[in-house]
Amino acid sequence: KLQDDLPPVPFEKIRASIEASFEQPLEALWSEFDPVPIGAASIAQVHRATTTDGRQVAVKVLRPGVRERFARDIDTYEWAAAHLESFGVEAARLRPRLVIANFKRWTNRELDLRREAASASELAEHMVGTEGYEIPGIDWDRTNGRVMTVDWIDGIKISNTEALKAAGHDTDEIASRLVLAFLKQAIAAGFFHADMHQGNLFVKADGTIAAIDFGIMGRIDRRARMWLAEILYGLTTGNYRRVAEIHFEAQYVPSYHNVDEFATALRAVGEPMRGKPVSELSVGQMLDGLFAITRDFDMQTQPHLLLLQKTMVMVEGIATQLNPKINMWDVSAPYVRSWIRDELGPEAAIADRIREDTQTLLRIPELVRRIEDRFPPKGGAPELPPLPDVEL
């Protein structure tokens, strides 16, 4: 994560790494390359450069040896997680081994800059038509597993509220737009930027939010997104019974528990939050309440939702800094309600049925072939007899 807080790798090593990965001199790709990085972190560092055709770009380069160091570190994490699970039921419920397995997968993706570039490209496609939110373009000719080149972004860090106001930006509007952009990614696209901390978001001169650093991405399938949207909408409207039912339908709560009791537990956490700006809420108390619910109702950790939960906290923190009076529920509810209507309405149901029927029809020829392979038609080759066991 590029938080400008680690000493950079000497430029000689960075140059050598770039030239080895492209098998050509650095000057063949960039006419100018600033040897002083604009950001350095544990995994990579970023340099400003100008391509040979005159474009301003940012070049992200993996730290030499970072892949080998991570491979050593993850062995320690896996050992610790396995021992933690052996301590008892409460530790096993948190599924630390599965959490570490997901962390390993996420980080291995982050260590391949081609994957990061592909993620940025995919997210840009999902966000087409979203006003005021931008993903920098990828320079594929100057990108490989160890180096990624993207369009240069000029802007103010989203965390610098004073500079944003001095430049004439409406920080309240930016806060709402950031929340809606995240909801579009997570709920509509099912593919979201999972590293939306303050160092990875900028505001351009025209007010556009520009995101960078796509090494960590989250993906949610359509069914989980439907559950998520209904849960969010249920919490915003106080329909705790429906939220509880969804948790049971998704099998997040073991079936031997009572739906109504779970709904009451949710109400105890949700009601104090409704109608209040984030500045008046205690996130710590809310998380304590939710964690108590997971414990009391034997809910296992859902690793596929950990990234989503982490990102939601990040987005809420930034939005609150931009607009201390923002009410996340009020901003989210209209979008979530509209998405649910579009996805659950009659037109969507008909489209889903047509899609499912088409997929079934397309599978029929393959099913027939497999049946004939298992049960040949008359005159076909007979099935081979089983071979006897012979002791040698």
What are these regions (language model features)?
Residues 193:
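Histidine-centered phosphotransfer motif of kinases
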Residues 1-190, 198, 202-392:
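Broad phosphate/nucleotide-binding scaffolds in NTP-utilizing and phosphate-metabolizing enzymes
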